[in-house]
Amino acid sequence: MALKSLSEAVSLLLKKPLVWMPGMFAAFAILFIYYMYTLFGSSVALPIGIGLLVIFPAFLAGTYGVIVGDKSSSADFRKYAAYGYFRCLIPNLVIIMLGFLLSNTLTYILLMVGLSVDVALYFSIFLVIPLVFFFYFADITAMVNNFPAFRALKDSVVKVTTGSFHITAFYLFNIALFFAASFIFSAMWSLLAVDALLPISQMTQGEILALSQNELIALFMAPEILSSGFLALAVCASIFIPIVVSYKACFFKRNLLKLEAEPKAEEQQGSFDADGRWYKYS
């Protein structure tokens, strides 16, 4: 079922061009943030990036809606984007805040125990993985079922823990997509910045180890390397974000969406006429 959902998601990229919208917006946001950083610095680029990130759930909601609702017009996309914006935004904000709170709490505890900063940060970042794993379907659940944020989070946990093999296969395919995107990003970045990276590649191991942390950061923050990285990231985002979002919606629709069965006519209050047509009593 996970593989069928993936193949369906890929086919939707051709059948429904609107599912490309999250990737197109993400690519635009990445390049726009880069130009704002280049022209005005991080003090301007950071709030703009946060603002664009807050807008992004509208594109998620629109894509979820046209896939789950089996629609394809731009009017339907806008309708679902407006309807599901806060339903997608709030659960994701709760997850981010919860991850921030738990990771910082764990970092302080590990530092008090006596572990180094690097080890403490490693364990704190690793803590985010279970949150993503269990709450992955919270936003689409909140939108489709019109659940409040915390009920959507709970429902996502229930779906994940009771999904057995299909959920496991779904996450494995997502991990494979992540590694594919990482490989393509690294290859594109290296290809675009080959001239700037050539001096670094010719350095010996001893020369690299002799560099301070600030010197290493300065090397990789060179304009050509930085612009190549942002361009490669934008290209990968425009390709893989639509695949991942469509895959999530297709899998949810095929495996996790519980449609209520319509009540049978015999169980309703009404009667049949002489021609066998059913009339429900009001």
Please describe what each predicted stretch is:
Residues 116-117, 251:
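Generic structural hydrophobic/aromatic packing signal, biased to beta-strands
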Residues 73-77:
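A general structural detector for well-ordered alpha-helical segments in enzyme core domains, enriched
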Residues 21-56, 91-112, 119-132, 170-197, ...:
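Hydrophobic alpha-helical transmembrane segments in multi-pass membrane proteins
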Residues 8, 55-72, 131-149, 159, ...:
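Juxtamembrane transition segments at transmembrane-helix termini in multipass membrane proteins
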Residues 1-30, 78-101, 133-182, 281-282:
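Interfacial aromatic "cap" segments that immediately flank transmembrane helices
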Residues 10-14, 37-40, 78-81, 114, ...:
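Helix-boundary and loop/linker segments of multi-pass membrane transporters
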